[in-house]
Regions:
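Auxiliary Fe-S-binding modules of radical SAM enzymes
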Residues: 1-38, 105, 203
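Cysteine-centered iron-sulfur cluster-binding motifs in ferredoxin-type domains/subunits
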Residues: 41-54, 66-89, 127
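Short aromatic-glycine motifs in intrinsically disordered, low-complexity regions
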Residues: 8-16, 83, 88-93
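FAD-binding FR-type
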Residues: 72-75, 96-102
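Acidic/glycine-enriched edge-of-secondary-structure segments
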Residues: 88-95, 182-188
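Conserved AdoMet/S-adenosylmethionine-binding subsite of the radical SAM
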Residues: 101-104, 108-205
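Short, intrinsically disordered, charge-balanced linker/junction segments flanking boundaries
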Residues: 62, 72, 79, 200-205
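Short, charged low-complexity linear segments at domain edges
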Residues: 18-38, 46-67
């Protein structure tokens, strides 16, 4: 792979927000499929990849977006003045910014479920490594509460972002998306060589 291609698909420079504020698009409670026990999953917004099969396409853009649900639209035209005036809720905002303190308060509401089920908190996306500094600080706080931590990641970021975060986790759900280097580069926009090297480093932790 040429250095220019590596730059094009890198997520080295994507992280632009302050490290005490994250951009998320959902908090899902009572999940049974994102790690051990009952888990609360925080979905981070923003992903450097373009997987055709993406389960959360609303997570790809790092921007806060507004979408219209056609089935809810009354065709009243009030949105022409201001989308926030929509009486039927046809307009939905995808994404919001949240502080460390606010997110900690939000997930700790579920602490009783974590303790009784052996569950905890999973950080997903999008791609959590695009907001690695925030995620690391957040998991450090959860560790002080004794909460089990996990991340779900495609692993396509510098090891300096991945490894400090992974060392705070009880589980790393590593989403190895594709094993063909050309398709990884051209279709998914992924640096497969870096992904595999990060996986090798993870298994040594």
């Amino acid at each position: 792979m040429t250095s220019s291609a590596g730059q094009r698909i890198s997520c080295n420079v994507v992280e632009t927000r302050r490290d005490d504020v994250a951009r998320i698009f959902n908090i899902q409670r009572y999940s049974l499929n994102d790690g051990e026990g009952i888990r609360t999953v925080v979905f981070f917004k923003g992903c450097p990849h373009l997987c055709p099969w993406c389960a959360n396409p609303e997570s790809i853009s790092g921007k806060i977006q507004t979408v219209r649900r056609e089935a809810k639209c009354l065709h009243c035209a009030k949105c022409l003045r201001d989308a926030d005036e929509c009486p039927s809720g046809a307009f939905e905002r995808i994404g919001r910014d949240i502080s460390l303190d606010a997110l900690e308060r939000e997930v700790m509401k579920d602490d009783i479920f974590f303790r009784t089920s052996g569950g905890g908190v999973t950080l997903s996306g999008g791609e959590v490594l695009m907001q690695a500094e925030f995620a690391t600080r957040f998991l450090q706080r959860l560790r002080l509460w004794g909460v089990s931590c996990a991340i779900e990641t495609a692993g396509d970021a510098p090891a300096s972002k991945l490894l400090p975060l992974a060392k705070l986790c009880d589980e790393v759900l590593f989403d190895l998306k594709i094993m063909d280097a050309a398709q990884a580069r051209d279709v998914v926009k992924m640096n497969l060589q870096r992904v595999l090297e990060n996986l090798r480093l993870l298994v040594k932790i």
